[in-house]
């Protein structure tokens, strides 16, 4: 066990490092240019595509994918168990997860419970641990999302998904354990019905909700976590205690991608539906002005911030802080993102220049798993695994 003097030194060193980390080079940098098509040290590689056949029974939909990804899923589930056991070494928490969690969190809506049971069966991972893997994303998703509109009224949507803060640090290669273990699980999915694409999404194999996706020709949506005292833990506790009138945020994204038929319908659902965890829904459409950030607490919408190109608002940027508040000074990705977009100018916005913005530190950081670029109108959806070689901020 660390002595108090050593522990204090480590904590103080970390605080001092963080105080300066996001304010000076090499932790920040000038806006990147010419990073697209992706290459070089910040590009880990492409993300594979798989098809999910929604005509199959829910229990069987994920079998083909999970046969391939079961080994990688077992690695990350074991890491999650190790993190839990580090706090409660007796192993009692994991025993409760395996034995009690399915009963406590039973009656998931729609097809999700059967899908998770099917994943548990094919991977031979206990159902409780599959459920734990699925609810993790109610709490730890830290992201940057952008929607832009060019001079012709054409919309683009980009996002970095950052995940894994405080979930294990590998001192041998200076990376977050969970972040690195999610990269082999990252997949692009083509959800089909009657052999036709219904929607496309990027997710982690084993997770049946969605955080990033689009319905070709109609709308795109990404989810960012919103920090709040009345947060996801409270929502989960209410669910366990029997109050199940709210939706899991990853499941509501999956639901609108599967069932909604327009930008306005999706906007209405994401604005009014009760949810288990506070969130930001970043929604893009297919016409001028159809782009917004919906700031949510668990019961209602607090703000809808929309594109307004006629008055010069040709982009919206959302990280993990309310737009009317200053971001936490140790985690300001909003300011550099807006600065780089302003330097780019509306005339030059494209997949390439959005990728440049999302490749600029600290928008790109040690937590970044992947970058997605979406063009709803053209039906383009590109996902790239990322790296942030040292020197690089931890978040």
From Swiss-Prot:
Disulphide bond pairs: 31-340, 388-392
Keywords: Disulfide bond, Glycoprotein, Hydrolase, Lipid metabolism, Lysosome, Secreted, Signal, Sphingolipid metabolism, Zymogen
Subcellular compartments: Lysosome; Secreted
Record note on modification: N-glycosylated.
Listed pathway(s): Lipid metabolism; sphingolipid metabolism
Pfam families named among the record's database cross-references: CBAH, NAAA-beta
A GO molecular-function annotation: N-acylsphingosine amidohydrolase activity
Enzyme's top EC category: hydrolase
Span of the signal peptide: 1-20
CDD domains assigned to the protein according to its UniProt record, in alphabetical order: Ntn_AC_NAAA
Residues under site feature: Important for catalytic activity: 162, 320, 333
Residue numbers annotated as active site: 143
Reactions catalysed: an N-acylsphing-4-enine + H2O = sphing-4-enine + a fatty acid; N-dodecanoylsphing-4-enine + H2O = dodecanoate + sphing-4-enine; N-tetradecanoylsphing-4-enine + H2O = tetradecanoate + sphing-4-enine; N-hexadecanoylsphing-4-enine + H2O = sphing-4-enine + hexadecanoate
Keyword Signal in annotation: yes
Catalytic activity, EC: 3.5.1.23, 3.5.1.-
Family: Belongs to the acid ceramidase family.
Protein name as catalogued: Acid ceramidase
Species, as recorded: Bos taurus (Bovine)
Designated gene of the protein: ASAH1
